[in-house]
């Protein structure tokens, strides 16, 4: 009942709104708060809230609001933990990207070293070609030397003409051997040609590898773009989640503002209540002044009130006992608070343990995810390795297939045409797939133009070769004419021998060159393996290739200049050789003419004899010479073609590598741009997180400030409460003194009336003593039952004790026994007085004057106690009416109903009790007391006064006890407790029971007296 009235008095509390708002958020923890109501109350007490004032308000709303604040703090902590986890994930991704970039740098350095080694190998090849050219020059010089030697030997042949014929047959056999050697040389030349073809195949294989790498790069680009798209989608999702979090935080901020508004309203209400208390204090001051005036009037009467002081001492002892019981209760409350604090600490520890367990689970989940990712990465790496191995197998198969192809110019042209077709097809496919790769088409067009330029250059080189061949044919013709003129010479046999020696030396040189070529082939195989091993790390060298691109272009230009210079030098050497050859031919012609003149002059006769044999021999020699010259020319042409082919292949490889480097540069630039964009995004997210942190810290600081303000208000309220308590104690003490004085005044007034009635009572006392002896046992039982009823009323409440007494007491009780019982119930005489009365009754003698005085004193004491109780209840009713005026205005209908119910209840109980004293007992009483009929009016004066007092007290209790729940065990202390109720606000159900027992007793006395 009290809580409903208080909730109506405070309709401003945000109980429903706060709880309804809290249920909106999905992550709210209002219903899952680990704190109980006891812990909440303890925290409120520590924060400075008054329990009495809080109980007058809506407890549930305040607890829900506190739980809401705590849940919001928990949500903030949870969100902060999630943000930290996201930060750690982003940092790990950044470190992975950084590690991949470092690996790309390392691979780029390795590719750079491989490229430098390839350039060195190309230089070595050029040097070997230069050596071959020098060897050809040496052969030409050796041939010239042989011609000079032939001239010298021609003179010797003049002397040994006869011996030459026999040696000619031997020379024929030697020529046959030389033919076999020449065939062996041809085979060696074919082997060299096969090696050249093999190098060409290797070059084609490298081209195919480059194409496969381009395909891999395109695939990687596609995969990288897909990954970028997935990452962008993830970032969009994360931004959406962040926006949702911002909205939730804004809603929470609005809720905090609403809560602040409600707190301000409550503060205004507290201020109004404080003003009301100030007005009450003013009223108390006025009452103090009136009480002081009355005290001055009653100071003269203190000497005659020693008996009242003794009673006050007893009451003080009872009060001290009550205070001791209250202290015990306070100690029990302190123990309970300590238990609650221990429970709260245990709950906090449990919550912390649960949070730690949750964090550990999250850490384990994150570690498991990282392990899964690492495993997936390892699986991808293994799959890539397997793919590379499969590609190597495919490359080897392709190499075997390419080895079966022909390496003629027609096949190369067809291959170039096919490559052009493939490139065009690839370009169309790439245009269909990606419209952004227009640059690749331009590169392909450039490649086609470069190939056409190379074709034109090859054509020019073919024309130059044809011109050189024509010039060489002219030279050959001249040499043939010179050799034909020298056919007549016998010294040609010696020339053949020298030629054989030189050919042997050339064969040895060729064998050595072949061994060198084999060694170079092995070395190239090793380098190929290294190159293939390092080719896998090309992606890492992208950034270094950017820096070295300019250096490579410079080297390329220097290398091109170097090649041009070497070509110019070769041309100059050719021209010099041509000039030397012309000079030598002219000198040979001159010497031949001189020699011929001499021979004609000296050996005209000898030549005529051996012309036939010489002609046959010279024909064979000429054939052999022609064959040897043809072989030499073929070898030269093959060497030149192989050198040209190597240069072409090297230039093609160089161009392809340059294009690949450019593509890798572009890819690396794109990746760097993407990484920069991601870094910028991460920086923006970090700034947002920092701003969120600052905002949360500001909110937390505002909350702390509000808590500090509440603490200050708590201290102020505590000081006010202590002041009010001190004033209350003073007022209570003064009221008690005034009540005592009033009781004494009333007792003195009643003493005169009691003395007048004693004479009448002494006459009836003798007759009543006999009846008292019969009722002693019943009175004892009634006293015991009254004690039990008071205890049961203090514990269980309501009217159980009175019902027992009504059921146990017989209907044949006398009116005097009922009067005594009512006086015992109302005034509660001590057991000592009852024992004295029983003693006097047992003696059965006539009461003396001493007995009369004692009985008069007892009556006076009972009368004064009844008056004091009535005055205290009246004062309590006045105070209660003053305090509950606002409540009565808000709830008039409820109070009326309650009063009507209570009065009806009490009237019903009084009727039931009056039925017990039915009219059947009246004649018996009249029959037993015939002599006292005339004295009954005088004896009923006191009873009528007590009835009036009890009626007044009953009305005050009925009007006041409807809205209060606090009282004590005895009716004498009920008034004091009711006075304390207005300031303390304690509610106790046992007070209703005790007040009801008093009302029942008073109603019973009224019925009996009537």
Curated annotation (Swiss-Prot):
Swiss-Prot/TrEMBL keywords: Coiled coil, Cytoplasm, Membrane, Nucleus, Repeat
InterPro entries from the UniProt entry: CRWN
Keyword NADP: no
Membrane topology value: Peripheral membrane protein
Expression by tissue: Expressed at low levels in roots, leaves, flowers and flower stalks.
Polar residues: bias regions: 883-893, 912-921
Gene Ontology CC, one term: cytoplasm
Regions annotated as coiled coil: 82-350, 404-763
Subcellular location: Nucleus membrane; Nucleus, Nucleoplasm; Nucleus lamina; Cytoplasm
GO biological process: DNA damage response; nucleus organization; regulation of nucleus size
Annotated segments matching region Disordered: 787-813, 839-937, 966-994
Motif (Nuclear localization signal 1): 445-452
Domain of life (superkingdom): Eukaryota
Biased composition (Basic and acidic residues): 849-863
Motif position, Nuclear localization signal 2: 679-686
Deletion consequences: Reduced nuclear size associated with reduced chromocenter number and altered nuclear morphology. Plants lacking both CRWN1 and CRWN4 or both CRWN2 and CRWN4 exhibit slightly smaller rosettes. Plants lacking CRWN1, CRWN2 and CRWN4 or CRWN1, CRWN3 and CRWN4 are extremely stunted and set few seed.
Similarity section: Belongs to the CRWN family.
Self-association state and partner proteins as the record states: Core component of the LINC complex which is composed of inner nuclear membrane SUN domain-containing proteins coupled to outer nuclear membrane WIP proteins, the nucleoskeletal CRWN/LINC proteins, and, possibly, KAKU4. Binds to KAKU4.
Described purpose of this protein according to its UniProt entry: Component of SUN-protein-containing multivariate complexes also called LINC complexes which link the nucleoskeleton and cytoskeleton by providing versatile outer nuclear membrane attachment sites for cytoskeletal filaments. Required for nucleus structure organization (e.g. size and shape). Involved in the maintenance of interphase chromocenter integrity and organization.
Protein name, as recorded: Protein CROWDED NUCLEI 4
Source organism per UniProt: Arabidopsis thaliana
């Amino acid at each position: 009942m009290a809580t409903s009235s208080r909730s109506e008095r405070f309709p401003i509390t945000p109980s429903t709104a706060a709880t309804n708002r809290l249920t909106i958020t999905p992550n709210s923890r209002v219903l899952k708060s680990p704190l109980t109501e006891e812990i909440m109350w303890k925290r409120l007490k520590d924060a400075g809230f008054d329990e009495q004032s809080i109980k007058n308000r809506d407890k549930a709303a305040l607890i829900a609001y506190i739980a809401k604040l705590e849940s919001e703090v928990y949500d903030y902590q949870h969100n902060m933990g999630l943000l930290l986890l996201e930060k750690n994930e982003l940092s790990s991704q950044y470190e992975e990207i950084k590690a991949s970039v470092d690996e790309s740098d390392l691979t780029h350095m390795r590719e750079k070293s491989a490229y430098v080694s390839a350039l060195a190998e190309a230089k070595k090849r050029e040097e070997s070609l230069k050596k071959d050219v020098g060897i050809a020059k040496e052969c030409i010089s050796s041939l010239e030397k042989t011609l000079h030697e032939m001239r010298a030997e021609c003179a010797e042949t003049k002397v040994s003409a006869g011996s030459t014929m026999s040696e000619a047959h031997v020379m024929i056999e030697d020529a046959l051997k030389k033919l076999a050697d020449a065939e062996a040389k041809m085979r060696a030349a074919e082997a060299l040609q096969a090696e050249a073809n093999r190098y060409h195949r290797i070059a084609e294989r490298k081209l195919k590898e480059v194409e496969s790498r381009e395909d891999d790069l395109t695939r990687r680009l596609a995969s990288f773009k897909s990954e970028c798209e997935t990452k962008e989608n993830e970032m969009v999702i994360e931004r959406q989640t962040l926006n949702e979090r911002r909205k939730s935080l804004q809603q929470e901020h609005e809720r905090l503002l609403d809560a602040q508004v409600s707190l301000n309203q409550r503060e205004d209400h507290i201020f109004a209540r404080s003003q009301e208390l100030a007005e009450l204090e003013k009223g108390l001051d006025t009452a103090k002044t009136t009480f002081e005036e009355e005290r001055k009037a009653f100071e003269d009467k203190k000497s005659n009130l020693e008996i009242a002081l003794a009673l006050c001492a007893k009451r003080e002892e009872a009060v001290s006992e009550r205070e001791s019981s209250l202290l015990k209760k306070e100690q029990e409350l302190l123990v309970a608070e300590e238990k609650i604090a221990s429970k709260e600490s245990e709950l906090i520890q449990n919550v912390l343990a649960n949070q730690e367990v949750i964090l550990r689970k999250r850490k384990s989940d994150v570690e498991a995810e990282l392990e899964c990712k690492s495993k997936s990465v390892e699986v991808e790496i293994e799959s890539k390795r397997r793919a590379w191995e499969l590609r190597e197998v495919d490359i080897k198969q392709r190499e075997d297939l390419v080895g079966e192809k022909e390496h003629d110019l027609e096949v190369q042209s067809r291959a170039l045409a096919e490559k052009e077709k493939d490139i065009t097809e690839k370009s169309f496919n790439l245009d269909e797939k990606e419209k952004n790769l227009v640059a690749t088409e331009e590169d392909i067009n450039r490649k086609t133009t470069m190939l056409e330029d190379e074709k034109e250059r090859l054509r020019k080189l073919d024309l130059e070769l044809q011109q050189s061949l024509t010039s060489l044919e002219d030279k050959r013709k001249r040499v043939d004419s010179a050799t034909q003129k020298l056919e007549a010479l016998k010294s040609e046999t010696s020339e053949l021998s020298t030629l054989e020696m030189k050919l042997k030396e050339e064969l040895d040189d060729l064998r050595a060159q072949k061994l060198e070529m084999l060694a170079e082939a092995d070395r190239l195989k090793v380098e190929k393996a290294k190159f293939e091993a390092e080719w896998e790390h090309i992606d890492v060298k992208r950034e270094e290739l950017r820096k070295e691109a300019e250096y490579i272009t410079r080297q390329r230009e220097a290398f091109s200049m170097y090649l041009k210079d070497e070509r110019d030098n070769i041309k100059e050497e050719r021209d010099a050789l041509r000039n030397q050859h012309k000079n030598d031919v002219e000198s040979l012609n001159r010497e031949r003419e001189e020699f011929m003149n001499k021979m004609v002059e000296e050996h005209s006769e000898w030549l005529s004899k051996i012309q036939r044999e010489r002609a046959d021999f010279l024909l064979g020699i000429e054939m052999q010479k022609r064959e040897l010259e043809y072989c030499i020319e073929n070898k030269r042409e093959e060497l030149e073609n192989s050198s040209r082919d190597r240069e072409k292949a090297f230039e093609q490889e160089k161009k392809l590598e340059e294009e690949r480097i450019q593509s890798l540069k572009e890819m690396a630039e794109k990746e760097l741009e993407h990484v920069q964009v991601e870094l910028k995004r991460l920086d923006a997210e970090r700034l947002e997180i920092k701003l969120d942190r600052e905002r949360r810290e500001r909110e937390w600081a505002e909350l702390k400030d509000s808590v500090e303000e509440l603490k200050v208000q708590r201290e102020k309220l505590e000081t006010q409460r202590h002041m009010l308590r001190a004033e209350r104690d003073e007022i209570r003490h003064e009221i008690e003194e005034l009540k005592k004085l009033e009781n004494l005044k009333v007792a003195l007034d009643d003493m005169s009336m009691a003395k007048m009635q004693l004479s009448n009572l002494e006459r009836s006392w003798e007759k009543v003593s006999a009846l008292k002896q019969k009722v002693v046992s019943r009175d004892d039982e009634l006293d015991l039952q009254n004690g039990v009823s008071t205890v049961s009323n203090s514990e269980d409440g309501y009217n159980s004790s009175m019902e027992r007494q009504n059921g146990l007491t017989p209907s044949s009780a006398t009116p005097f026994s009922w009067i005594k019982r009512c006086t015992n119930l109302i005034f509660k005489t001590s057991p000592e007085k009852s024992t004295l009365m029983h003693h006097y009754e047992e003696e059965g003698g006539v009461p003396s004057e001493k007995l009369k005085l004692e009985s008069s004193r007892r009556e006076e004491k009972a009368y004064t106690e009844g008056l004091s109780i009535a005055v205290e209840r009246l004062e309590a009713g006045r105070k209660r009416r003053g305090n509950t005026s606002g409540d009565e205005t808000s709830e008039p209908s409820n109070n009326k109903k309650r009063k009507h119910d209570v009065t009806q209840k009490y009237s019903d109980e009084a009727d039931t009790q009056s039925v017990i004293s039915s009219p059947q007992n009246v004649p018996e009483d009249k029959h037993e007391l015939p002599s006292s009929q005339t004295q009954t009016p005088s004896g009923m004066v006191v009873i009528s006064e007590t009835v009036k007092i009890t009626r007044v007290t009953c009305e005050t209790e009925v009007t006041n006890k409807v809205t209060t729940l606090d009282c004590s065990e005895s009716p004498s202390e009920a008034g004091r407790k009711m006075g304390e109720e207005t300031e303390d606000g304690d509610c106790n159900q046992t007070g209703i029971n005790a007040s009801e027992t008093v009302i029942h007793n008073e109603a019973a006395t009224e019925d009996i007296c009537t």
